[in-house]
Design a protein with these regions (language model features):
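Catalytic-pocket segment enriched in acidic/His residues
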Residues: 12-13, 74-186
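Extended, compositionally biased flexible segments
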Residues: 1-71, 75-82, 183-184
Length: 186
């Protein structure tokens, strides 16, 4: 499940992503041919550890223990004129549209710093102050509408600057300086 605009609860957008969209760190991303250009932007992934519905924000810290950096891939210049890149699942949930790093424990106290580089060149830096509070609020907001189950992934999207992807490139992303995601683009 991808959550956009979590810092503005009134404008929060939620969309579900297919399991086949996930590419694990170390695996290659085969850049699709159905759009002219593809780009990636940083996100933070949280793995849900227990079943819950209508979770109050003050209890949401009990529902996750691990986080990782991820990248949300999107395309532009669609070959199919009827594809709306903002709402169509073909544009948002295609195979390979979510690049996932390796999960690491999160103490719930520290701020998070996420970085994205392509071919060693820094492309995006996202500093998240009060990360625990924002994650807890996102879990609370989403659980009002969806039952969260063990193993579900909640992706908080940076909606920041996008980095252009190109075949032959290497994408790396780190969380708090620890490289967590490495993907070769083919």
């Amino acid at each position: 499940m991808l959550v956009n605009d979590i810092e503005n609860n009134a404008g929060m957008r939620v969309r579900q992503i297919a399991d086949s969209a996930i590419v694990a760190s170390g695996k290659p991303l085969f850049v699709p041919d159905f759009a002219g250009h593809f780009s990636a932007r940083l996100g933070l992934a949280v793995r849900i550890d227990r079943l819950g519905k209508h979770i109050d924000a003050r209890f949401a810290h009990r529902y996750f223990q691990q986080v990782t950096v991820c990248c949300v891939v999107s395309g532009s210049d669609w070959a199919d004129a009827d594809v709306n890149p903002e709402t169509d699942a073909r544009a948002l949930s295609f195979d390979g549209s979510l690049l996932m790093g390796n999960f690491q424990p999160y103490d719930g106290k520290s701020d998070l710093s996420l970085t994205l580089s392509i071919d060693g060149e820094p492309k995006q830096d996202w500093r998240w102050n009060n990360a625990a509070g924002k994650l807890q609020q996102a879990i609370s907001n989403v659980s009002r509408y969806f039952t969260l189950k063990m193993g579900d992934l909640l992706i908080c999207d940076s909606e920041g600057e996008q980095a252009e992807l190109h075949i032959g490139g290497k994408l790396t992303a780190a969380i708090n300086g620890n490289e967590s995601l490495t993907i070769r683009l083919r």
